[in-house]
Amino acid sequence: MKSASSEQSVERIENGHKKKRNRPQKQNRRSKQSSVPIEDAHVEESLDGRDSSRSKAKDSTSSSKQQRPNTDELEAMRASNVAFNSMPPMRAESGYPRRSASPLLSSPEVSKQLLSKSCPDPRACEQSPGMNGELFQQIEGSSQRKIFSSHWSLDAVTEALEKGEAFKALFRVNAHNRNEAYCKIDGVPTDILINGNVCQSRAVEGDTVVIKLDPLSLWPKMKGFVTESAAKPEGTNSPPEKDDKKARQKNGIDVVEGFEDGFSKNKSSVIGKGAKNGVTPSSPPSLDSCLGSFCEQKGNCSAVDKLCGILSSFPHKRPTGQVVAVVEKSLVRDSIVGLLDVKGWIHYKESDPKRCKSPLSLSDDEYVQLMPADPRFPKLIVPFHVLPGSIRARLENLDPNLEAELVAAQIVDWGEGSPFPVAQITHLFGRGSELEPQINAILYQNSVCDSDFSPGSLTSLPRVPWEVPEEEVQRRKDLRDLCVLTIDPSTATDLDDALSVQSLPGGFFRVGVHIADVSYFVLPETALDTEARFRSTSVYLMQRKISMLPPLLSENVGSLSPGADRLAFSILWDLNREGDVIDRWIGRTIIRSCCKLSYDHAQDIIDGKSDVAENGWPALHGSFKWCDVTRSVKQLSEISTTLRQKRFRNGALQLENSKPVFLFDEHGVPYDFVTCSRKGSNFLVEEFMLLANMTAAEVISQAYRASSLLRRHPEPNTRKLKEFEGFCSKHGMDLDISSSGQLQDSLEKITGNLKDDSVFVDILNNYAIKPMQLASYFCTGNLKDSVAEWGHYALAVPLYTHFTSPLRRYPDIVVHRALAAALEAEELYSKQKQTAIDEGRSCFTGIHFNKDAAESIEGKEALSVAALKHGVPSTEILSDVAAYCNERKLAARKVRDACDKLYTWFVLKQKEIFPCEARVMNLGSRFMTVYISKLGIERRIYYDQIEGLCADWLEATSTLIVDKLYSKRGGRGFFKPMKEAVYLVSPCEVCVAKCSALSVHDTESPEAVSIDEVAPAVFPLTIQLFSTIPVVLHAVGGDDGPLDIGARLYMSSYY
């Protein structure tokens, strides 16, 4: 049930915009679109029953003539309606079948001329003509144009990749501004900016693309760039010129990929300045000349090495490029969730009496727009002739409530002459302001299978009541007389790990971790194994769980329920008082848990609270008494503390913030949230799970060098880590980033000095998390020549895997099979060599690995036979399993994060407003970024172009003064109402509210508490970095747009 920590994906979030020029029309010409085949990965058949059929669309040349917008309106149409922080991106799930696209729009051939601005105000994109009738009127009269260039052919792509003239990359879009996208090239530490809709060339979030880099002279300066001198403490004598020279002399940067388990929900922001903005009168050399010069110095090298050398020589430059081909379309194209722009279409129809009839007669040449909930996706065109009958009928009857219905669509075509992709509706969920439709949409969008288990997968399950077969009793070590207990959340039903401890002579302890032996029930290549591999992981929502395995297995015969005989995989360590492992034993066992403790129960025992056996404590089973349980928990707590201290001394890193926990009523509806942090009992369990995972990784990687499933976490991004170092130095904090251990020690010293400011500690941890990325599963055979890359940076260990949660993670089952094979190989080897059982059984799984035995003819044969029997996969198959499990794990995390946001939104909607304190994390002339510690989230507050508000930014002192204007602004310009940036109350209202709160204080009203806690500020308000200011949170969207959480300044004024 536990993992080491929670994974954190830190995205680059960067803004951009586009400026266009009209071109002369070129009539009666159609382009020949070069297509690039999609690279199909090995996939499994979808079990979610999603309809993959596609309505065939007729040629829509006439429709294109009437409805294609001209380029003057593209800027507004490209941006999403509402900008909000989306979840971490997920690579396309390879476990779902692809759907072929059918062309719906023609693509006339016209030249492209659309250039991008650099980082416009995202709020300018919040409302576009697509939300009213103007867009439809403009589309009607637009002419056919070729907006995008044709994609390169497959031969051209292959040739360019071989010559190093183009690069294959993963396409990611900025959630704050869709005009900015970033491409990750494997082996390159800096992402490539793809600035503008034309340069993105119809690529969609998650696509695998081929990009061509712009000349070096067009690369803009990287905002937020920190030189080495800036990262040094004040008082150093090294001048900036020397530091810059050192930076240019570097020829490579370490590549980083991931972070095991972070806790921040926030994302970093590195904003580029647009392709044209980096040009100076003395431009740097061209990219080609730099590549040639670098190769002359270094000899033969790959295109990636050349690019890394250039980036190292020009660390202040942001590389830019353009997409020339989409080689693998993201499967998220098939599950885009959003709302139909019904009101805009109705307004368009009503603007012309000839079109306004009731009921309307809908033409197949017309369409309605779909506004995606995720701002990383473009608006979609849904032609009427592919609309479901129910939606079409409601449109004909001008049903305005249709706009509140949450729908899913799939992209079927995006021609060179269309500003938007063409889509068709695949699912209707319900009203966007209700919980259940939103949850179903989240699951659908992340391709989480919530259907019943197939009948075939259930046939291999044992019948209940189930007892341990006699042959298993004979084969396994019987530990039913051992005091074994479980510690889990109070609501847990899938108990897959248990603990035990025994005191040994000489001050030693024998600690046991016992994991449910799921591989006994889930055999390789069975229907149950196929379904478990397809689901890959259990998905935990707030009030329910979507299991990877059928409940009969995960909650009954496989779960380590108290008082029941259960099959387990056990690891027993003999430890001294310093936490050193003296000896170990690994094997398959039979256990019987004596009790199921919650984390709170275990914490009460650790804290020494009396009468632990009373007041609703769990029942005891077997011959054990509560004194046995309390002694075991206390001993385990002491040992885990020793192990934890030793792990951090060895360089482990721990970044953790508190997070809100939701309170639900009897109907399962959230009504409030409270802050919760982990207890000592959580760390107790975590420490032994980490030790078990590290032990399993060591055993299987030694026994099966080319076919072990491990989990790696490379070092963090060097540039971002240096930015964090510079940030700390600027604010008088010494940070050592030379290793994970030094980073941990530095953070502990800094936070020790800030122990009275827990909010700033949270902010510091957020900054520290941003250079980190996701850890990932991998097959050792893929990195057999790069063993140094197997390590785990955050845990500071050379080998790590997942072994302890086989009821909810498929990789753990794979690891169990490899471990079972290693045990079987030991038995086979001992029989062949006719050695003593104790000696033979320790050769592959003992504390000392017998390399000579493993490399002998008998050893190789034993390992091979055991691998075949237990289903240890080959390198090729295991690589596919690792990649797919990475995708599914990330999808499950995205579901969890989206549900957290959904429940927060729902509680705020009920409260209407939520006053709270916020800490300013970022400050400028247009907006500030604030951190709300109660929710653990960051939000932006924009204050420029607000009617009645004056925001003076003092650059010299980095100070913002916000004041109220008592007269209207002169001149022309668009200004938004004050209520969008400020929640303004009268001092009289505050006094009345406080009096009311005091009068009902005995009722413990939540409203009374919130009003009592935070008081509004008054004008003028002076704000600096890290200032604490009052804000009001509120729910945004639902029936009328994507869900978001808005923040405004909380101010008081008589006027």
From Swiss-Prot:
For the region Disordered, what residue ranges are annotated? 1-109, 229-249
Cite the InterPro entries for this sequence: Dis3_CSD2, DIS3L2, NA-bd_OB-fold, RNase_II/R, RNase_II/R_CS, RNR_Ribonuclease
Q: Where is the composition biased (Basic residues)?
A: 17-32
Q: Which keywords does UniProt give here?
A: Cytoplasm, Magnesium, Metal-binding, RNA-binding
In what residue span(s) does the RNB domain sit? Answer: 476-824
What function is annotated for this protein? Probable inactive 3'-5'-exoribonuclease. Is unable to complement the growth defect of a yeast mutant lacking RRP44 exonuclease.
> What protein name applies here?
Inactive exonuclease DIS3L2
The organism of origin for this protein: Arabidopsis thaliana (Mouse-ear cress)
